[in-house]
């Protein structure tokens, strides 16, 4: 089947794009897609949808204060969005300015410290931060939380907690693994009491997750790279779950991408790596049996991923249903629970 970008388009009324979180994390709705069947549930019903011995794999990345404002040596205003730290004193970043800064120039950020532009690495600027402080510490104190571009407001104090998962630990993402935002501590305790297991990995979400696909021929698209760490304990938990005949359930597309990316060249192994895996309908999943995920943007690589997981036509029906029933979309929106179809196309 030859697919183009237009195969992943849908009409979304702007008022369905959630601009703020609900009062309670688990108060969101949950659209269950199992084969051809759709079921409208609440996220609080999740314990009824999983079985003792099932394994939930969470991404414990933490969103950093990746957005900074400042000036060039000429006095021109700039906006910097850190893509990733590449050491204690260096980072790759997007820089928005009327004129791109030159290699060797200095930028004054947050009216607090200077960075040096070392050059370009692909689409990003390579920045050198002061030796006196770690990059992530400087961002924590002087940066701002980077809300997604479809949320048309600035981050506030409420977002500092609600745009993080309750289990976020490892600093490094510029966007939240949003499927995890629905879990609160009582929900995690209820799942554990039922005998549902949890495991952890880390995948740091880059700004590339918001970049649109710019080619209609999907074979020409090149995915952005994202870093992951999969502990040995998680690999062992997955093996034990499979041996017991239970399901591996990825909490979010980031967890799925890390697991499937790490299993591309053979059996899943613990370790650190990078993935640029582009998942389209026809992809054969190696590790994940079910997926918890939010609703994704039209024509996005994440919509392509979930369409590969459930089947393109079932996913189209699910999104048509979600729009028709006024589900809330994107980062602060509602969620889906999707069972993988081995015959998905």
Curated annotation (Swiss-Prot):
One of its GO terms (molecular function) is S-adenosylmethionine:tRNA ribosyltransferase-isomerase activity. Pfam families: Queuosine_synth. Pathway: tRNA modification; tRNA-queuosine biosynthesis. Keywords: Cytoplasm, Queuosine biosynthesis, S-adenosyl-L-methionine, Transferase. It is an enzyme of class 2 (transferase). GO terms for cellular component: cytoplasm. It catalyses: 7-aminomethyl-7-carbaguanosine(34) in tRNA + S-adenosyl-L-methionine = epoxyqueuosine(34) in tRNA + adenine + L-methionine + 2 H(+). InterPro entries: QueA (IPR003699), QueA_dom1 (IPR042118), QueA_dom2 (IPR042119), QueA_sf (IPR036100). It is found in: Cytoplasm. Its EC number is 2.4.99.17. The keyword Chloroplast does not apply. Its main location: cytoplasm. The keyword Acetylation does not apply. It comes from the Bacteria. GO terms for biological process: queuosine biosynthetic process; tRNA wobble guanine modification. Monomer. NCBIfam families: PRK00147.1 (NF001140), queA (TIGR00113). Transfers and isomerizes the ribose moiety from AdoMet to the 7-aminomethyl group of 7-deazaguanine (preQ1-tRNA) to give epoxyqueuosine (oQ-tRNA). Belongs to the QueA family. This is S-adenosylmethionine:tRNA ribosyltransferase-isomerase. It comes from Aromatoleum aromaticum (strain DSM 19018 / LMG 30748 / EbN1). The lineage of its organism: Bacteria, Pseudomonadati, Pseudomonadota, Betaproteobacteria, Rhodocyclales.
């Amino acid at each position: 089947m030859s697919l183009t970008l237009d195969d992943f388009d849908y009409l979304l009324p702007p008022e369905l794009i959630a601009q703020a979180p609900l009062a309670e994390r688990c108060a969101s709705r949950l659209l269950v897609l199992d084969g051809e069947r759709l079921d409208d549930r609440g996220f609080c019903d999740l314990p009824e949808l999983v079985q003792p011995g099932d394994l939930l794999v969470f991404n414990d990345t933490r969103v950093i204060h990746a957005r900074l404002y400042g000036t060039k040596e000429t006095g021109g205003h700039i906006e910097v969005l850190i893509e990733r730290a590449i050491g204690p004193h260096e980072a790759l970043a997007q820089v928005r300015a009327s004129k791109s800064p030159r290699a060797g120039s200095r930028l004054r950020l947050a009216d607090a410290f200077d960075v040096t532009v070392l050059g370009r690495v692909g689409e990003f600027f390579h920045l050198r931060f002061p030796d006196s402080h770690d990059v992530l510490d400087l961002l924590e104190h002087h940066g701002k939380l980077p809300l997604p571009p479809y949320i048309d407001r600035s981050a506030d104090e409420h977002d500092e907690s609600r745009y993080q998962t309750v289990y976020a630990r490892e600093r490094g993402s510029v966007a939240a693994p949003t499927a995890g935002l629905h879990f609160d501590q009582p929900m995690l305790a209820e799942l554990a009491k039922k005998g549902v297991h949890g495991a952890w990995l880390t995948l740091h979400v880059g700004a590339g997750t918001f970049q649109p696909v710019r080619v209609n021929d999907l074979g020409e698209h090149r995915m952005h790279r994202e870093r992951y760490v999969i502990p040995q304990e998680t690999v062992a938990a997955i093996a034990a779950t499979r041996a017991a005949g239970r399901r591996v359930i990825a909490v979010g597309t980031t967890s799925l991408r890390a697991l499937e990316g790490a299993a591309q060249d053979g059996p899943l192994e613990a370790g650190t790596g990078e993935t640029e895996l582009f998942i389209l309908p026809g992809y054969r999943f190696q590790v994940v049996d079910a997926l918890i995920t939010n609703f994704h943007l039209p024509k996005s690589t994440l919509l392509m991923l979930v369409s590969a997981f459930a089947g393109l036509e079932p996913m189209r029906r699910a999104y048509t249903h979600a729009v028709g029933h006024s589900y809330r979309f994107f980062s602060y929106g509602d969620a889906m629970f999707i069972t993988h179809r081995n015959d998905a196309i």
